[in-house]
Structure formats: C-alpha cells, structure tokens
Regions:
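Catalytic core of membrane glycerolipid acyltransferases/transacylases, capturing the structured
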Residues: 114-155
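Membrane-anchoring hydrophobic helices of lipid-metabolizing enzymes
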Residues: 2-120, 155
C-alpha cells in the first residue's frame, strides 16, 4: 500500500510542481486568469462534486440562488489561490494588494500585548492573514496540519 501511495504522491507532486514552473513563467496576472478557467472546467470532474453540491444544498436549503454559479465562482477562487501560493514571498515583501480593515484595532492589540485569538477560515488565500499579523508585530502561533502528499510539504 505504501508503494502505491508513494508513486501516486510522486506523480501528483511532479504534476503540481510542473504547474508551478509554468505559473512562474507566464506570471501572476495571466496565471490567475488561466488557472481560474482550468479549475472551473476540471474541478467538477473530481469526486468532491457531489459533496460540494450536497453541502451547498444544506447551507442554502430553499433559497432560490444560482448554485451552479456559486460552485463555478468557488472553483475560480481555488484556481486563483493555487496560483497565489507560488507568489506568497512576493506578497510578503509587497502588500499593496492586501487591505486590512480595522487596522486601528490591530495596532491597539500590538500595543497592549495581551493574548488574543484570531479565527479564520479557508477564505481565498487565508495564509496571508498570519503573514500580515506577523509583519504588524503580533507574536503569533499557528496550527498547521501537513499535507498528505509529503512531496509537497517542503513547498
């Protein structure tokens, strides 16, 4: 079983690292557009499709919303987030794309140096929150579960 997982993870990682190189070559702006489109087209082919639809039906129940549009926007967002992982170091140096609301509250927290809990979810590129908090001077600890694919964890 380990050998099957090993080769499965190896092939996945080669595929993903190849995408990463391609993304670096064509740049952030075009990559976000392209991978948004790719994820919209390929995302529904994954086995998670039924789970996504089921969860959306539970969350929205009788609301008369265009659920296909919501799912399409979700896949588009995943494509953009995938691309942005490669550029996290650039974002760390140049934060003109990040808007912090309530910066006065953040400054007060840093000044008061009292314990506080920040809660986030998997919204867009949520890793940027901890990066910006650290840059603002917040003494921060984060919880991280390594990826199942051990070839991708070093990245």
């Amino acid at each position: 079983m380990f050998i099957i997982k090993f080769f499965k993870y190896l092939i996945e990682s080669i595929f993903i690292y190849t995408f990463f190189v391609f993304i670096k070559i064509i740049g952030l702006k075009f990559s976000r557009i392209l991978f948004s489109y790719i994820f919209i087209k390929l995302g529904p082919l994954f086995k998670s499709k039924l789970l996504i639809e089921e969860n959306l039906n539970k969350a929205l129940q009788d609301k008369n919303l265009n659920k296909k549009h919501i799912i399409s926007k979700m896949w588009s967002n995943y494509g953009k987030v995938f691309v942005e992982y490669i550029y996290l170091n650039r974002f760390k140096k140049n934060n003109n794309h990040i808007k912090i609301k309530g910066n006065d509250i953040l400054e007060k927290l840093v000044k008061d140096n009292k314990p506080v809990i920040f809660i986030s979810g998997h919204f867009a590129n949520f890793e940027l929150m901890s990066m910006e908090l650290t840059k603002a001077g917040v003494n921060l600890a984060t919880i991280y579960r390594p990826l199942n694919n051990f070839f991708l964890n070093p990245f």
